[in-house]
Amino acid sequence: MPVVTVYRHGGKGGVAPMNSSHIRTPRGDVQGWSPGAVRRNTQFLMCVREDKLTGAGFALTLTVRDCPATAQEWHKMRRAWEKRMLRAGMIRLHWVTEWQRRGVPHLHCAIWFSGTVYDFSLCIDAWLAVASSCGAALRGQHGRIIDGVVGWFQYVSKHAARGVRHYQRCSDNLPEAWKALTGRVWGKVGDWPLFSELRIDLQDHRQDGDGGFFAYRRLVRSWRVSDARRAGDRYRLRSARRMLTCSDTSRSRAIGFMEWGSL
């Protein structure tokens, strides 16, 4: 049955299986970014109520010079930094782990503190303290203020646009010792104001129609083409035009989509 899910800042659509009686395999070890991890991160960002993000916010990039020997060591540093931020008054955090071309991880995050005082040194100094064993240096850390709604969307536009093939998320750039186990690649902490998703079940094509699913997909494609043409992005334009192209008729009926927008 076709299903359309609407979020505050986008939506997705697809065909749910008629019979989901298969036995799900237990979740295994996380081995870098996967399509599922990208999708779940994007869905979360789509649900955030940007008008309710109170407090003093920063967008940070935290780096190290030397690659931690194991993923466990990296996450130990990240969790130690999170605890320091909580003690300092952090109210919410979103983070992602990505890799440089040389195979060294870095942390991107959006963090808020209660009050209105912006103190970059608090965040940076805490990171330098917990990551000193990996050669973290002051000049390798970057940050800027998340200035209200515009600042949040600037952060989202960067970290929601990257897919599993982006070089910073590609498994080819994983350190050799990390390829069997990377641990979680994104997460959230604290009080996040979220807009509840709206799920719409459409009539299946085997029940005298598709309930408008095919027409809706074409509308999404037309919007993507128009948006890419307006931006002058030839790669996005080519991708938008081909999003529903499939030579297999049965498979073409089930092609889904996921796109940003606003309510």
Curated annotation (Swiss-Prot):
It comes from the Bacteria. One of its GO terms (biological process) is DNA replication. Keywords: DNA replication, Plasmid. This is Putative replication protein PDa0002. The lineage of its organism: Bacteria, Pseudomonadati, Pseudomonadota, Gammaproteobacteria, Lysobacterales.
